[in-house]
């Protein structure tokens, strides 16, 4: 799924937007705006298709934007990660250092300054929902956080010779496992529905407490993403 909004500024072509790659519809709604087109899907083939369609219209760069699972144990929900690279199924893919530096600098003097970190990310094909899974990934990679879209965005950006950057907000911290109800409502296309979540809770009502904690984590991540998008827009940091 994709949507185009506004015209961007960039060294490649001032009329071309940056493409924000996300996994979920709400992330895309936050990301899109003047100069930024957003594509989203939870299933990798759908995401690749949406990104390919957006690329056919032209772009000046690709940014992976949205939420992530925490791997580094010291990082709280709502922490923003501006990544230097993503390691995953396609190996290690570096981000554009100058663009990444401008993204990070945009948070100076804002409430986000204390919540933003730089480091590496991990990319996976299936969600890491358990504490042990996250711990193993952290030991293996040293990555601060993990998501399912950044390695795809990075591989395509590299193949096309486009600048690539990443801005991700942590939802579930390293020490928190996700109950099955937390992911039950996510459709392949990146939209959500409530009925599967309710069915999971009916099957296992004891998940409710954990689900409410996840909801609190999600609010923190969403707040950080909204604030980040505003700060990046004000600073002009989304233009390549």
Describe these PLM feature segments.
Residues 13-240:
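Glycine-rich phosphate- or other oxyanion-binding loops that anchor nucleotides, phosphorylated ligands
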